[in-house]
């Protein structure tokens, strides 16, 4: 069932969203603005209006939507009461929420890339190839030289992960981790406190897709900022990670 926030406004179907962060991210995208530049009071107001409208229409909402509504209401009320001089604790709550939203955005983007690659791989398996095509491989497609694109890094690291943990993945149950990409940034940097060069196996140490995606987001962020450089000299060869020019201890 779809509900409209305003008579001529956008139509929302709560089933289109995977959770409150997904709904918030959609509202941010509509404003076409960076997450950390968003007016949180305005965003909170819009979110709360949607939740109220859904409740008025007697639509069942998962508890996490209501928890987020309570969180936003508290932050909004605190910011309104304190005016320009916002309490440090309120500011921290605001930063935590925006950071969580930014991390969710990264997670969603990576998941979409992985999903796209999965579909492309299925197409390749279904496609009937000629004997000659089986031996053709695009030049340097799987070589990492420290300046590879984000997409190439994702695809290569995903392939290496599946190759390394192929057997264990078949026996591993779906799991939930409380780790965040920020936690994994600290973990990766801890490895560099003890090693000049870190390998793929040292970073991706668990046969879990959830752990892989969370750690991948952390590694890609460090690579994007050129804190780390990622190398692989040949397809399925050792992937090594080294400190980049912008590395911060």
Curated annotation (Swiss-Prot):
Top-level taxon: Bacteria
Keywords: Cell cycle, Cell division, Chromosome partition, Cytoplasm
Entry's localization field: Cytoplasm
Pfam family, one: SMC_ScpA
Gene Ontology terms describing biological process: cell division; chromosome segregation; DNA replication
UniProt entry tagged with the keyword Membrane: no
Alphabetical list of InterPro entries matching this protein: ScpA, ScpA-like_C
GO cellular component: cytoplasm
UniProt entry tagged with the keyword Cell cycle: yes
Signal peptide residue numbers: none
Family of the protein in this entry: Belongs to the ScpA family.
Protein's job: Participates in chromosomal partition during cell division. May act via the formation of a condensin-like complex containing Smc and ScpB that pull DNA away from mid-cell into both cell halves.
Subunit description: Component of a cohesin-like complex composed of ScpA, ScpB and the Smc homodimer, in which ScpA and ScpB bind to the head domain of Smc. The presence of the three proteins is required for the association of the complex with DNA.
Name of protein: Segregation and condensation protein A
Record organism: Mycoplasmopsis pulmonis (strain UAB CTIP)
Designated gene of the protein: scpA
């Amino acid at each position: 069932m779809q509900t409209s926030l305003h008579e001529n406004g956008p139509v929302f179907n709560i089933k289109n969203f995977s959770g409150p962060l997904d709904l918030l991210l959609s509202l941010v995208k509509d404003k076409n603005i960076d997450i950390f530049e968003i007016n949180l009071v305005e965003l909170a107001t819009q979110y709360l209006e949607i939740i109220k409208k859904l409740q008025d229409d007697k639509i069942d909402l998962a508890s996490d939507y209501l928890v987020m509504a309570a969180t936003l209401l508290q932050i909004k009320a605190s910011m309104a009461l304190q005016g320009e001089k916002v309490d440090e604790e309120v500011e921290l709550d605001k930063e935590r929420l925006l950071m969580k939203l930014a991390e969710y955005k990264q997670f969603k983007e990576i998941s979409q890339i992985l999903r796209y690659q999965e579909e492309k791989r299925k197409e390749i398996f279904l496609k009937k190839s000629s004997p000659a095509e089986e031996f053709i491989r695009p030049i340097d497609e799987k070589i990492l030289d420290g300046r590879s694109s984000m997409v190439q890094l994702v695809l290569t690291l995903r392939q290496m992960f599946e190759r390394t943990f192929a057997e264990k993945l078949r026996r591993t149950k779906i799991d939930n981790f409380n780790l965040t990409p920020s936690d994994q940034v600290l973990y990766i940097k801890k490895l560099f406190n003890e090693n000049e060069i870190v390998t793929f196996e040292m970073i991706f140490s668990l046969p879990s897709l959830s752990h892989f995606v969370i750690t991948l987001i952390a590694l890609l962020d460090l690579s994007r900022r050129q804190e780390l450089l990622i190398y692989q000299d040949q397809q399925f060869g050792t992937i090594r990670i080294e400190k980049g020019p912008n590395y911060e201890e």
